[in-house]
């Protein structure tokens, strides 16, 4: 089954995939250089800092002496990463061998950053000029609510309802793979869309941001400029207000889209307008593997396939409905059951057993999460068995042949099909056989020659 593929796990993977010209342009921004330095593997970071004030190429043999004998593989990974990001330039010389030098722009900006001690991309507004700002708890609640509303829009649109309050930029992201629309029917969730809903929040967020960046040129926005601005956001202080007048028109439009996702909160006073970054925005440059601590789960799974979800979230209820039968819903409790029919419906929509099991494990209630396994083994085994039930039959396009003039012609046709690895089935008594469609033309020519 097709899967939602996150090609780049974080911003740095996407930065590395940029053309050389755009990558060099990014390094004109001090904050990009700092963000990339933070993201590097420990050994790669060590190499950059050691070479920061060396203006001549460093021989590869000398760098190999900087690591222990058992660190060869880590050394190679670090060098490859630095070359991939164009931080290192590899210089080959027949006499002197291979050497490496730092990207001069990257080097100069890091030197300036170390000397100046680091300056914020833009200063927060004075508290006198802004109205009462939300607390960090209120801001986190707002971000969660916005993100859940965003995902509910995706689910509702998949059920035939129109998208409301979603910008055209975000609508295009939905249409790039999460939603499909036929001529007469309304939009429907694709297999990737169903799988997307079972991802954890960090994976979902990065998928949306990645598509937003890839879609940038269609909005006449330079992807390098967009990446630069998004990475700058990660250096802002969560909960502080920043004046919108300091931003370009493109950056203002970007913030409106990010507000849909809950990455920023937009506010307006009598004179000024400002944005307030949430924790989602300041964590943008963090990789999926290093993302925030595991959130508290809410699902209790029993051995009898009944499931209890302690949640008041409409979104969580709709996600559970993707693979379970909702039996009743109380203000803070959703009672449901995993059945063969509910799972078959999930499998038909492209969701896999592993995705369902991973979702249940990641969202296990704290009292269940500590036990091993957190989900009863009979439940996980049965989910996988029901999936294999649908995989027992493999569909292959084929052609059926009968009414052979003689036994010899039939046997010759069988041998010919075997040679071409196209024989699927044969009945010697009735002289019938089935071959793959790929060899149909060859089989037809062969039978034509046999009839002469």
From Swiss-Prot:
* Record InterPro entries: Tfb2_C, TFIIH_p52/Tfb2
Looking at the keywords, is Plastid present?
Answer: no
What does the UniProt keyword field contain? DNA damage, DNA repair, Nucleus, Transcription, Transcription regulation
- Which Gene Ontology molecular function entries are recorded, alphabetically? ATPase activator activity
Q: Which domain of life is it from?
A: Eukaryota
- Among its keywords, does the record have Nucleus? yes
Q: What is its main location?
A: nucleus
Q: What's a single GO BP term from this record? A: nucleotide-excision repair
Q: Name one GO cellular component term.
A: transcription factor TFIIH core complex
Location of the protein in the cell: Nucleus
Its family remark reads:
Belongs to the TFB2 family.
State the protein's purpose. Answer: Component of the general transcription and DNA repair factor IIH (TFIIH) core complex, which is involved in general and transcription-coupled nucleotide excision repair (NER) of damaged DNA and, when complexed to CAK, in RNA transcription by RNA polymerase II. In NER, TFIIH acts by opening DNA around the lesion to allow the excision of the damaged oligonucleotide and its replacement by a new DNA fragment. In transcription, TFIIH has an essential role in transcription initiation.
Quaternary form? Component of the 7-subunit TFIIH core complex composed of XPB, XPD, TFB1/GTF2H1, GTF2H2/P44, TFB4/GTF2H3, TFB2/GTF2H4 and TFB5/GTF2H5, which is active in NER. The core complex associates with the 3-subunit CDK-activating kinase (CAK) module composed of CYCH1/cyclin H1, CDKD and MAT1/At4g30820 to form the 10-subunit holoenzyme (holo-TFIIH) active in transcription.
What's the protein name? Answer: General transcription and DNA repair factor IIH subunit TFB2
Q: Highest lineage ranks of the organism?
A: Eukaryota, Viridiplantae, Streptophyta, Embryophyta, Tracheophyta
Gene that produces this protein:
TFB2
């Amino acid at each position: 089954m097709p899967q939602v593929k996150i090609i780049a796990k974080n911003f740095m993977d996407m930065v590395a995939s940029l053309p050389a010209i755009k990558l060099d342009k990014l390094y004109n921004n001090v904050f990009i250089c700092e963000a990339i330095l933070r993201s590097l593997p420990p050994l790669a970071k060590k190499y950059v800092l050691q070479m920061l004030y060396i203006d001549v190429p460093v021989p590869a043999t000398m760098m190999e002496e900087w690591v222990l004998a058992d660190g060869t593989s880590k050394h190679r990974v670090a060098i490859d990463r630095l070359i991939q990001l164009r931080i290192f330039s590899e210089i080959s010389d027949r006499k002197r061998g291979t050497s490496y030098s730092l990207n001069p722009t990257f080097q100069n900006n890091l030197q300036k950053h170390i000397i100046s001690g680091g300056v914020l991309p833009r200063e927060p507004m004075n508290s006198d000029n802004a109205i009462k700002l939300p607390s960090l708890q209120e801001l986190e609640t707002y971000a969660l609510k916005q993100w859940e509303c965003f995902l509910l829009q995706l689910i509702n649109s998949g059920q035939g309802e129109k998208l409301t309050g979603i910008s055209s930029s975000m609508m295009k992201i939905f249409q790039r793979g999460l939603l499909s629309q036929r001529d007469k029917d309304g939009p429907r969730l694709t297999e990737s869309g169903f799988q997307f809903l079972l991802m954890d929040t960090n994976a979902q967020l990065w998928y949306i941001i990645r598509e937003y960046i890839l879609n940038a040129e269609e909005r006449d926005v330079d992807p390098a400029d967009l990446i630069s601005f998004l990475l700058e956001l990660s250096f802002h202080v969560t909960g502080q207000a920043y004046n919108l007048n300091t931003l370009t028109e493109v950056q203002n439009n970007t913030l409106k889209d990010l507000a849909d996702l809950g990455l920023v909160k937009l506010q307006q006073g009598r004179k000024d307008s400002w944005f307030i970054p949430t924790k989602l925005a300041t964590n943008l440059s963090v990789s999926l593997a290093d993302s925030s601590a595991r959130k508290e789960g809410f699902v209790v799974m029993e051995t009898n396939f009944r499931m209890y979800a302690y949640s008041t979230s409409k979104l969580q209820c709709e996600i559970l409905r993707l693979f379970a039968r909702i039996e009743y819903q109380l203000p803070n409790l959703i009672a449901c059951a995993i059945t063969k029919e509910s799972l078959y419906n999930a499998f038909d929509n492209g969701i896999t057993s592993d995705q369902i099991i991973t979702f249940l494990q990641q969202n296990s209630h704290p009292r269940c999460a500590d036990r091993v396994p957190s989900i009863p083994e009979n439940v996980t085994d049965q989910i996988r068995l029901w999936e294999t039930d649908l995989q027992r039959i493999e569909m292959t396009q084929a052609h059926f042949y009968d009414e052979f003039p003689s036994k010899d012609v039939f046997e010759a046709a069988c041998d010919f099909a075997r040679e071409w690895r196209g024989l699927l089935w044969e009945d010697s008594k009735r002289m019938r056989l089935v071959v793959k469609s790929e060899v149909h033309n060859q089989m037809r020519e062969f039978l034509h020659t046999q009839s002469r």
